[in-house]
A protein has these predicted regions:
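Active-site gating loops and adjacent loop-to-helix segments of metal-dependent hydrolytic enzymes
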Residues: 58, 79-90, 131-156, 199-211, ...
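Alpha-helical scaffold segments that flank or form the walls of functional sites
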Residues: 47-48, 55, 66-118, 141-155, ...
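Divalent metal-dependent hydrolysis catalytic cores, especially in the metallo-beta-lactamase
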Residues: 58-60, 75-104, 117-130, 157-168, ...
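N-terminal metal-binding scaffold of metallo-dependent hydrolase/deaminase domains
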Residues: 1-37, 370, 374-375
Length: 376
């Protein structure tokens, strides 16, 4: 048994700000909280907040998950994002061959078996997408679902699974089948009309991937997928708040429209995070990094160079969202989405929760990241 007494001079526990809290952490889990500051192992003078949870991470630290997926690559990506406060992530495989999907699943199974800190499951973004809204995904690899994909998706050793799909390319029966397997189904890269999207939600889809991006827009006569996302209070949407993917006013509109918890922050991060890379290969093209914006040679946005710390700062400072709500959008709300049918173990710093913590300075930059009571 390992025990640590951690003194937070100021703590945001997921619900409110409190001062002089001492967290007793046993084997990585918060077992008690008191105010006896005489007997502590660690003193923190910054603001201690719940660790950030990113449900859409393609890469980081110079590595792209799609490029020869392995557990070492997962560790590289996780390490890069941990520096910016991410304590749990869903490594994301974009549209690729089924053989690469299987390799990614093998890497995830190994990471789960080895208890690699911060790796909680896998997000398959594609390949069952709309060609009309493919973005930077490879058109030649977009395809209907087959038995080969079902073999990968049905595995029980790869942690939580998220699948992003276009509902016009996948039947409602297949969506329901995924949900029964415990898969979280998100709608994205879709040109579906409102009716088709709504049928997918009725069949069990509960999320929308990078809201506003690569989906049919809202207009007066056709609400589209965006309208479906905003109208259904029982769904949650990921939002990229980097100033490139979505106008800040549109971000504000979505947050005001959805009930509390309806929007969570994601990065859609690519290899440049944590590096000074200016370009990198993706499929058969090159992606260029300029002023934080990633653009492929064919002109599309190609993911982001965003980290979760910057996403939180942008949400608070650019969108004028209260700090406590911006922090929930990076921790509590993605945890609620991920663990909707189970007892959550992340997202708050309360008794019984995993001790995933981030220490911030006055500018909301990350000073320390702790995963399971261990500094990383």
């Amino acid at each position: 048994m390992t025990q640590l007494r951690f003194h937070a001079k100021r703590l945001f526990n997921g619900q409110q700000f409190v001062d002089d809290q001492v967290l007793t952490i046993i084997d990585g889990v918060i077992s008690d909280i008191d105010q006896n500051t005489d007997d502590v192992d660690v003193k923190s003078t910054g603001l201690v907040v719940p660790g950030y949870i990113d449900l859409q991470v393609n890469g980081g630290g110079g590595a792209l998950f799609n490029d020869a997926p392995s557990v070492d690559k997962l560790k590289t990506i996780m390490s890069a994002h941990a520096k910016f406060g991410t304590t749990a992530m869903m490594p994301t495989l974009i549209t690729d061959k089924v053989e690469v999907m299987a390799q990614a699943a093998d890497a995830m199974a190994q990471a789960i078996a080895e208890r690699v800190p911060g790796i909680v499951g896998i997000h398959f973004e594609g390949p069952h997408l709309s060609l009309a809204k493919k973005g930077t995904h490879c058109a030649e690899l977009i395809r209907p679902i087959s038995d080969d994909e079902w073999q990968v998706l049905s595995r029980k050793d790869i942690g939580q699974v998220i699948v992003t799909l276009a509902p016009e390319t996948v039947s409602t029966a297949d969506i329901t089948r995924m949900v029964k397997l415990g898969i979280k189904v998100c709608l994205g890269h879709t040109n579906a009309d409102f009716e088709t999207a709504q049928k997918a939600v009725d069949a069990g889809a509960t999320g929308f991937t990078h809201l506003f991006n690569a989906m049919s827009p809202l207009n007066g006569r056709e609400p589209g997928v965006v309208g479906c996302a905003l109208l259904n209070d029982n769904t949650q949407s990921g939002l990229i708040v980097d100033g490139h993917h979505v106008d800040y006013a549109s971000c504000q509109l979505a947050i005001k429209t959805k009930p509390a918890g309806g929007i969570f922050l994601v990065t859609d991060a690519m290899p440049p995070v944590g590096t000074d890379m200016k370009e990198f290969p993706l499929y058969d093209r090159t992606v260029y990094v300029e002023n934080g914006k990633l653009t492929s040679t064919t002109g599309e946005l190609a993911g982001s160079s965003l980290d979760m710390a910057t996403a939180v700062k942008n949400t608070h400072l650019k969108l004028k969202i209260p700090l406590e709500e911006a922090l929930r959008m990076a921790s509590l709300y993605p945890a609620q989405y991920l663990y909707a049918n189970n007892i959550p173990t992340r997202g708050e710093l309360t008794i019984g929760m995993q001790a995933d913590m981030v220490v911030l300075n006055d500018d909301f930059n990350v000073l320390e990241t702790w995963i399971g009571g261990e500094k990383v």
